[in-house]
Amino acid sequence: LGLYPGEFERVPFEDDYFVDVERLKTFVKSCDVIVHLAAVNRHTDAHVLYETNMRLVKQLIEAMEATNSCPYVLFSSSIQEERDNEYGRSKSDGRKLLEEWAVCNGASFTGMVVPNVFGPFGKPNYNSFIATFGYKLTHGDSPTVLQDNEVNLIYVGSLCRHICDKIREMGSRTAPSLVERDDVACDFEMKVSEVLGLFENFKKLYFEQGIIPPLNNIHEMNLFNTFRSYIDMESYFPVKLVQHTDVRGSFVETVKIGVGGQVSFSTTAPGVTRGNHYHTRKMERFVVIKGKARIQLRKVGTDEVLDYYLNGEEPAYVDMPVWYTHNISNIGDEILYAQFWINEWYDPTDSDT
């Protein structure tokens, strides 16, 4: 939603609204649409998990009824509704409670039954086996496959687009209120062992050698961007490049790629900064060829800034993760020469910038 500030106005929400009834009431009164994603995914006590998830739904309903508010509610349930566990039951029962509220109050409701979600920054050992694989492989551990099932997977970006489209559809709807179960389609299916095999290849080529691996489709690209998100940015970058030097000068290999894209270079005057944008899908590499540079990265939604100092006398690169604002500044006294590789040709109509 934050990518479309001219279309959607986000109403701030904090977790502690669930322990402050008045603030929760104020929140629901301010909303035309509420997307309810809050839930406990795992807990050592299954009863606590179920009761917590149900309590969150009931508190939302109570706040809406107390304020006579009838926003369009989208609820994130799970394909685990069909499984015999407390998490699945909590999602199914929560969805049905919200359906009943919508019918009784003439409100619109979409109960999304969502496949297994993955994407950058998921919590290892909690959100997804993909998060666990990515974290372990980039932190010196070796994951194992416990159950090699075929898994329905959806990238978090696809789910967000689906939610945005649902809100748009409701905004243009002229018919009476709608109450629906929405079985969200997966992006693709893959065995757990196949995901692990891909990630092990990402580790071997990219994490250990700096080679951009072959990515055969958008799903593998999304998996690669997810893998990259678990790298410890502060300790991993910048990566020094090998210089081959003789009487003729120096030769440096800056990027080895298994995919296409676009290579460019820039000159930057002393004291000038380029960039200050982020990408949601693109991969990008900055290489300092000559001069002194500072590259800065900041994860969207946080205040921590990572500073990397590079010098053309020791050529090195920094790769830009998705959802990190980045820039490059000339901190020297001479012209800065930098090379950029990005995995897509620039398209001004879809710049992802």
Regions found by a protein language model. Give the residues of each.
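Conserved beta-loop-beta element that borders a ligand/cofactor-binding pocket
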Residues: 7, 99-122, 135, 141-152, ...
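NAD(P)H-binding glycine-rich loop region in Rossmannoid oxidoreductase-like domains
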Residues: 16-67, 80-84
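Conserved Rossmann-fold NAD(P)-dependent oxidoreductase catalytic core, especially the SDR/UDP-sugar
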Residues: 55-105, 109-112
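Mid/C-terminal beta-alpha module of Rossmann-like enzyme folds, strongest
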Residues: 158-243
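Glycine- and acidic-residue-biased ligand/ion/polar-headgroup-sensing regions
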Residues: 182, 281-300
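A short glycine-rich, His/Asp/Glu-containing loop-to-beta-strand
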Residues: 235-276, 282
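Short acidic-glycine-tyrosine-enriched beta hairpin
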Residues: 299-323, 327-329
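Double-stranded beta-helix
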Residues: 301-304, 331-353
